[in-house]
């Protein structure tokens, strides 16, 4: 998706040129990146737009994790779990309300010992 490439370009080349000034964690660009990875374009755009509007001296700031809606289906517990999955776990879904979850990114790399 072109939005993800633009955001990564901003984070890699433009963001280091200015001081860190985001009032929230995760930063607005990281928040936008997570939104565009997990939501459709329009929902991600509007939630990012309103987040950037809140990132000013009139708001307190703090932790503001993205919220996503997701349907989880019960899994069949009769099979053996596969621990050597091809994809590494990237996000945690922390319950918020009904089918709404906070999205928290895992930042630590797994090391084989």
Curated annotation (Swiss-Prot):
It comes from the Bacteria. Could be involved in insertion of integral membrane proteins into the membrane. It is found in: Cell inner membrane. GO terms for cellular component: plasma membrane. InterPro entries: Membr_insert_effic_factor_YidD. Signal peptide: none annotated. Pfam families: YidD. Keywords: Cell inner membrane, Cell membrane, Membrane. Its main location: membrane. The keyword Cell inner membrane applies. It is a peripheral membrane protein. Belongs to the UPF0161 family. This is Putative membrane protein insertion efficiency factor.
